[in-house]
Amino acid sequence: MQQHYQFDAIVIGSGPGGEGAAMGLVKQGARVAVIERYNNVGGGCTHWGTIPSKALRHAVSRIIEFNQNPLYNNSRTLSATFPDILRHADNVINQQTRMRQGFYERNQCKLFAGDARFIDANTVSVSYMDGTQDTIRADHIVIACGSRPYNPSSVDFNHPRIYNSDSILELNHEPRHVIIYGAGVIGCEYASIFRGLNVKVDLINTRDRLLAFLDQEMSDSLSYHFWNNGVVIRHNEEFEKIEGTDDGVIVHLKSGKKVKADCLLYANGRTGNTDSLGLENVGLESDSRGLLKVNSMYQTALSHIYAVGDVIGYPSLASAAYDQGRIAAQAIASGEASGHLIEDIPTGIYTIPEISSVGKTEQELTAMKVPYEVGRAQFKHLARAQIAGMNVGSLKILFHRDTLQILGIHCFGERAAEIIHIGQAIMEQKGEGNTIEYFVNTTFNYPTMAEAYRVAALNGLNRLF
């Protein structure tokens, strides 16, 4: 029998954006309904994206560390298959799911496990697996339904050897050779994972360099590291046809080349999950990639309907999505948002080694004609890196020659995504608080990776004249 519910707010999706919105609203005393398509909360971030890929990377990193560290003096090489490390990822996913389920239960958020669809501007239907439906009405609605891999119709994703970045987690055989089509963040991260398992990797890049949004020095470092570890990178290539065979996949490139491997991971773009929401019933329209336009308070064209997370596009980061949800909750509760996303959002790319950056790149500062200087520290010169056997990597600080204000920080190496936040904290200081001299005038624990900031600061300041 169909039930009819009334809430203060409806949140569609339980990923980082939906969680941020729901938790922010209940803390303000609102009665919140959360509609999640799947039986478990967490969204794509927890089940197919950020969490599993980082868990896989961690497992592979530890295997590489064991095999390369002379401390262990191994007579044999430790090895694992992709299905082996998937078990570690599954354990982490289960822990994350239980924890996040507890958030909703403790805060008395009503969860509905079904597909959401707009009936009108204040009413959403929930369709369940058994064919039944309920309807929910609310004054405010937050769309946080996330995104999914972009699957072009010309590629047969039903073929058992052709995967996207979601279905790759169902890989149950042991490939010796993998083609990864798309050299964005996801493609590069999985290239690191598979190569770390001693799987041959062909990385097909549709552009002229890897991760072109990065500082070129960081991009070049990753390219060299891939090359040094045996990843074959094919730049400026596009597929003509992807052919599934009985024992693998053949990719026919527009340049005339052909590449054959045991399987293919297609990782070239994502699309918003808005096609089944019934947006036409409320007069909203998504773009060609399923994304919604919003204002600074994450309101859509209808002021009581908000959208956050991957479904609004850039920056498409789990960290930013949570903050967007929290800001939208503030706007709903008080009519305006006191918070806002910081201007310089840190980026973490979990390749092996990691890459992380915040602020401007050298290329951007040069184009802006900003008089900047560079301070560098190489990890191989740090005692902590030598102790840990993590000598690959560097930290680069970009700062204004005259004011000494930090303009950008770029890090390549183990724990880069952690190290970056030290510099970010100083960059966020107002006025004279943002200065490279902080790293010279403060005392760091020794030995630490954080010491790279002092080394880089001294290196940069010594360039001034």
From Swiss-Prot:
Binding positions (FAD): 36-45
Chief site of localization: cytoplasm
Requisite cofactors: FAD
Enzyme Commission number(s) from the entry: 1.6.1.1
Cofactor binding description: Binds 1 FAD per subunit.
Keyword NAD: yes
Function: Conversion of NADPH, generated by peripheral catabolic pathways, to NADH, which can enter the respiratory chain for energy generation.
Protein name: Soluble pyridine nucleotide transhydrogenase
Source organism: Serratia proteamaculans (strain 568)
Lineage: Bacteria, Pseudomonadati, Pseudomonadota, Gammaproteobacteria, Enterobacterales
